[in-house]
């Protein structure tokens, strides 16, 4: 978009934070609480619940309308929030603690993490953030049909999730923006606190590059929605908290070729099944199971809007119509795989492009975990299960179907994969700065050396808190 005027707008603060999601809101909260002046730059707008319309939610709340795809053999759909509050607005608010084993893997990759950010310090930051965000265990009354199926499928190995919510009613519309405004998303919690402490939020303000002079970051160049250019200057530091993909891309746009271990994402598969339970599937809150950890997988009972659940039903004509008549009985589970594959973010015509492909072992574990989940869903009380394979049985309802499912080859693009968890694998120094650039802090999961195997919301806010508190101590 061409600017309406050649004038460059200018403003300044002690700290400039790029991004208002989990990391940006946590960083802004602690920076502002210290008495520093803070400006938060957010590309999107303040969110409003989209109601029941899935297309409207995708257009208003998601980057690229939820249609971005990683370049590579697996065609993984990349789901990222693009609004004030970032992906926290359209997530389920699940706060899974960072496993110590994942932190130990970071230390194996980079021994400096042992002293750079000890696990105890990170876990204390998590406890602090859990208290601030009113993180509570999901009550049984809100666990819905998908959760009940999971508890019956994996007795003793399915647990309520810990969530940051306020009086959740189990509306089942988390992915569209909670219609009851019960989600403790960043815009309603940490960012609201930051504003009370004096932070300013500039929405509709897309960061284009970091301004660097003599090896020091001194601000951000951004484009406003009306086309005008803005220079937002930082007296002390710039915090990149735009998400692992966007933060990695901003470094490239700023003339920095970052080093690291390579980008990772956690592939997500959705498994749908027809429940025979009296509890309906249109409402509820997530439940999680660790039963699939031998495959490097986490299993979550999720609640999706009706239209989204309908998209997972197989068949055409009368067969599909019959299944749609039972849409209230369709329960969904999410499987998240911790991968070994690495990729990279590139700049493509002024936009980020993720290049990523799973390893053969990753694909095989995806299929093994999917088969185990299908078997579990049938055991839990589903009459038929829909595994979503491109070449494989569309419906699984018997032992024979399970055998055919296990025999499916682990080829690229066999599974319709999505990703909502991203990890940049980029190097930082002991002040969490980009090496060689003073005052440019990586405050989000772009700095995580590897995937962590669980949803990263809690780990991201804890990391941003620990990093920020080091800067204002």
Over which residues does each language-model region extend?
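Extreme N-terminal leader/targeting segments of oxidoreductases
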Residues: 1-15, 33-34, 72
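N-terminal Rossmann-like FAD-binding beta1-loop-alpha1 element of flavoenzymes
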Residues: 15-40
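Glycine-rich loop(s) and the adjacent beta-strand/alpha-helix scaffold that form part
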Residues: 30-33, 37, 44-49, 83, ...
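Rossmann-like flavin
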Residues: 84, 88-170, 357, 361
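A glycine-rich dinucleotide-binding beta-alpha-beta segment and adjacent secondary-structure elements
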Residues: 167-174, 209-213, 382-451, 457
